[in-house]
C-alpha cells in the first residue's frame, strides 16, 4: 500500500485498454495534423504513457489495444513471434479465388517488398465484397 498525505494511491504497473476505434482517428500517440486514439481516452489514461499495439488506418474502425507494457506489445507485434491477426474488410469490386491464391503466396508490393503469406477467406463477392 502506498499513501500520500494519508490518502491511499492505487498503483498498477501496466495498463491495458481495449478501444473500439472509430473512423477518423490516427493510431498514434501524437500528430500535429489530426486527432489520435489517445484523444478518445479520459485525461487520467492519457497521462499513463499508453501507445497503440498495432495500427488501424485513419478511416478504419475496429478493436485496437493500447498499453504501456512494451514487453507484451512486442510479443504481439513482432513478425518473429508469428501471432495471427484477423481482419474483416469490405472492398469495392469482386474478390476471386485468384486473390485468395495471391494472399497465400505473399503479396508483392511496390518497391519489391513481399508480404508474408496469409489466408484470405472470401465471405461475399460482388460489386462490394467482404473478406
PLM regions and their residue ranges:
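Basic, flexible Lys/Arg- and Gly-enriched helix-loop patches that mediate nucleic-acid binding at interfaces
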Residues: 1-131
